[in-house]
Amino acid sequence: MAAARNATPTPQNGRDASRLSFAKITDTLTVPDLLALQTESFDWLVGSDAWKRRVEEGTKQGRTDLALNSGLEEIFEEISPIEDLGETMQLGFTNPYLEEQKYSIDECKERGKTYSAPLYVEAEFMNHLTGEIKTQTVFMGDFPLMTEKGTFIINGTERVVVSQLVRSPGVYFERQQEKTSDKDIYSARVIPSRGAWLEFEIDKRDQVGVRIDRKRKQSVTVFLKALGLTSEQILEEFKGVASIELTLEKDSILTKEEALKDIYRKLRPGEQVAAEAARALLDNFYFNPKRYDLAKVGRYKINRKLGIDKQLTDSVLTVEDILATIKYLVSLHANETKMNGTRDGKPVELRLDVDDIDHFGNRRIRAVGELIQNQVRTGLSRMERVVRERMTTQDIEAITPQTLINVRPVVAAIKEFFGTSQLSQFMDQNNPLAGLTHKRRLSALGPGGLSRERAGVEVRDVHPSHYGRMCPIETPEGPNIGLIGSLASFARINSFGFIETPYRRVVDGVVTDQIDYLTASEEDEFLVAQANAPLTKDFRFAEDRVLVRPKGGEVELVAKENVHYMDVSPRQMVSVATSLIPFLEHDDANRALMGANMQRQAVPLLRSESPLVGTGMEGYAAIDAGDVLTADASGVVAEVSAEVVTIQLDEGGTQTYYLRKFDRSNQGTSYNHRVLVSAGDRIEAGEVIADGPATENGELALGKNLLVAFMPWEGHNFEDAIILSQNLVKDDTLSSIHIEEYEVDARDTKLGKEEITRDLPNVSPELLADLDERGIIRIGAEVRPGDILVGKVTPKGETELSAEERLLRAIFNEKSREVRDTSLKVPHGEQGTIIGVKVFDSQDGDDELGSGVNQRVVVFIAQKRKITEGDKLAGRHGNKGVISKILPVEDMPFLADGTPVDVILNPLGIPGRMNFGQVLETHLGWSAKQGWEVEGKPKWAERLPDHARQAPAGTKVATPVFDGALEEEIAGLLDSTTVTRDGDRLIGSSGKTRLFDGRSGEPFPEPVSVGYMYILKLHHLVDDKIHARSTGPYSMITQQPLGGKAQFGGQRFGEMEVWALEAYGAAYALQELLTIKSDDILGRVKVYEAIVKGENIQEPGIPESFKVLIKEMQSLCLNVEVLSADGQAVSLRDTDDEVFRAAEELGINISTRFESSSIDDI
């Protein structure tokens, strides 16, 4: 994936992807593999070769924190051995391994299967009584595999497992103000990965208390005595600590036995106390590895915090840990600042401090591997219960590992995780960036995380420790703001799950090339300079005092000798999507957030075009997203077609690459590969062979470079509305292809088999014209709403046949059988061209269609959507708007040389929103499009790189985030742009020019800002939103039309709209809306009848909602009656017969569109 990691790509075969960069700082580190977060975690889980190589390299470098066992090995080791209650036999598991996968990725997508491999494990059964050992290899179910792109294919759909941000296990100290007095109350919590919490607290009376498993508080000295310490030992340990001495004085318990019983009483009130049971209870809580697990990370955090040197594999608490926690707590309470401890075998002085729970040193990532591992653990513990049960019930002689093990719980747990977990999500495949960002997402929600309702502002807020780890900008707007983030560009995750970010080591004021990855806790101990701190030629700081970031996030100036580290890149604090926004430094953060989010909604266009003004991240993002085909090895292209590229490899042999043509993505956009190479071309490893959707020459290309003018135009661009030129429609500049998939099953019903056929009852031959002899539509047919895609008939209930009918049936081979037409038709509001048909038949044997399904037909319809009024466009700076008018090209304002502009934007969209990046982008875009040449040595060009002093027309430029082109450089380049044929320079350093009105040819009174801006077409397309209904489904209770396009619903006419009609006195319009157009059941059938027969419409009846109201009032014991004018009670019951009679006469049955029990039709 990350093969193409050369800083300056060499142009080959005319495929030049290099950009002219305005960067002043050279990156010491190239962008890492952006999918490593997913792939490395899964490699560890299954123990792949790549993971083994990484462990080998790490061991050579002397790293001790790496896991030496794969995730699956760990978990089977943890559960082994399973023993029966009498400990007479045991079952152990070793060496889990995966066999070859059953289906390829493409087969899984086509057939709706899961991309997985069978998991096997060696099981060993031992009978202690006879010493007999039986070993077998046992199948543990199919284990879903990750594709190269970091996704899973579950039941044919591509899914992503999002990494979770959770509180790390460890020990935490807190300070809170006591409500009544102003005293500080200190507390400590020991939080394990699994098991009971242990909490200590010093109250306002200076008593030290302990809570076991969140139950009642009790004295800490009782707890210590229960652990085996005597009063003398406690006094010895806490010499001179007043709070402990005070607590001990009030404690009347003397022996360990009494202490255990006292704790048992408080934990299990009302039960008989036995000393043995009391001891077992405490052991099970904190000292039994089956019940309590700190995990390596918890042990690591406790060691670091309390200055203890225990092995990382010690996963349970020890008395030493508990004593150290209490010592730390009482020292905090006594306002001490330092304490002695040991780290890595050396004595150290620890800084005493309370913990910040939102600090990234206390929050860790649970990546894919760990999430699946936890799920397998759940499945295995369920299986463990079954194994124990079977050990006691089966005949000892006949027991084998196979008879004991039931893999169903394990398979079910994995299936449940991938199918229903909050963290296993339907992949966002709108464009390559959407997929890449989805895989790099960090979520604080999900099982074991936070919930939206409980999360306060502090958790959601940006924290200083996020720097270089989680993007402060890219997060959703709405209820999830701050709970879902995105991993920063250079960040990586260490073996404990903490996010690390790279820094350049500074030694005695000299910046070295050594790169250290630091976690948030480690970084707190150092002073870090920013990446753009000026350096001399020998990499020393140019200034005596350097701006640094100490702990706490506030910046300060320090002497250069005191600096420890320096950022590796100016863009290391932002995520991939944010680093694609040029001039981000000139945008308000709220708008940058919208810009980062809206790039993910851009639809791949018919012809992709990479931005004139980029940031240099486009290539990295496109290649790592995996939608661009790159060469695995060097060679020469032997054969090229639209679907296959074959390469003759240098080391011998050939390699074939298959391209995807017009596939449907998860979001219904077109996924299509376009070949970039020709036969005979030389290809190096990592070079681009074919572009995917929304990429050009291996660079991300989400939108189009369009000529924009910032000016008001007849009020048509009021409130962010956008005016476009007809040229963009005519030339298909902003057209996109959308593909929908429809399927139909032929099943076995109680009355017989459904049949896919062309022979449909009461259907005219014109409607069957595009169906083949099987009754399936032909490829290439143009279809409109209501057209038949697949002909299907379903048997009706049969009556007893007479002899004549039976004879007819025998002669005509059952042709006169009673069937109804249940064909698949094009839904309302859809149309397009048939581009593919797939037929699956259960008789072929290899297609497992599910029970009762004989045949399945899948039809793909593609439609080309041109840009139209109502579509949403956006720039990369959060500047979004809806197209209000498409003007003929002759009416558009034009430049002095006659060039009409493409887009007119409202200048009022800029000052209030404070996203000035778009203006700078527009000016630089103009210079890049025209080309430039800098003459002489002007002052503004001093910091320009040498290669940027001249550029031909159409040069693609890069202006990296926080290190891009300066304002004076842009103004200077505008003055240096290439002149037109007439020797004119259309736009000067002001960035403005005189525009002429296309309608009159007169110049506009004021100069207008004109230039090239990169504009995206977003997925909010008007064709998907527009909707109309005449008749359709009604709600069961109220009998009013349903709401929303998906339900084919009506338009809500609410309370305020009723007031408006009342104000106009439009009584008849109002009456119709509230009765016959809504829920007057009898009335609406009669209206239909009257319209069909051409009669006058009758008086409306009583709406159903009025009857519901009366029923509700009667249920409140109010006797409500409706009286006629003469005082007689009126019955509100309709005669159903009347409705049915009218409906039958008209032959209307509109209920076929929605066959649902909760819906009634007219």
Curated annotation (Swiss-Prot):
UniProt GO MF annotations: DNA binding; DNA-directed RNA polymerase activity; ribonucleoside binding
Catalyzed reactions per annotation: RNA(n) + a ribonucleoside 5'-triphosphate = RNA(n+1) + diphosphate
Disulphide bonds in the chain: none
Keywords for the protein's UniProt record, in alphabetical order: DNA-directed RNA polymerase, Nucleotidyltransferase, Transcription, Transferase
Transmembrane segments: none
InterPro entries for this protein: DNA-dir_RNA_pol_bsu_ext_1_sf, DNA-dir_RNA_pol_bsu_external_1, DNA-dir_RNA_pol_su2, DNA-dir_RNAP_su2_dom, DNA-dir_RNAP_su2_hyb_sf, RNA_pol_bsu_bac, RNA_pol_bsu_CS, RNA_pol_bsu_protrusion
Any one Gene Ontology BP term: DNA-templated transcription
EC number(s) given by UniProt: 2.7.7.6
Cellular component per GO, a single term: DNA-directed RNA polymerase complex
Alphabetical list of Pfam families matching this protein: RNA_pol_Rpb2_1, RNA_pol_Rpb2_2, RNA_pol_Rpb2_3, RNA_pol_Rpb2_45, RNA_pol_Rpb2_6, RNA_pol_Rpb2_7
Family, per entry: Belongs to the RNA polymerase beta chain family.
PANTHER family given in the database record: DNA-DIRECTED RNA POLYMERASE I SUBUNIT 2 (PTHR20856)
Its job: DNA-dependent RNA polymerase catalyzes the transcription of DNA into RNA using the four ribonucleoside triphosphates as substrates.
Subunit note: The RNAP catalytic core consists of 2 alpha, 1 beta, 1 beta' and 1 omega subunit. When a sigma factor is associated with the core the holoenzyme is formed, which can initiate transcription.
Protein name (record): DNA-directed RNA polymerase subunit beta
Naturally occurring in which organism (per UniProt): Clavibacter sepedonicus (Clavibacter michiganensis subsp. sepedonicus)
Gene of this entry: rpoB
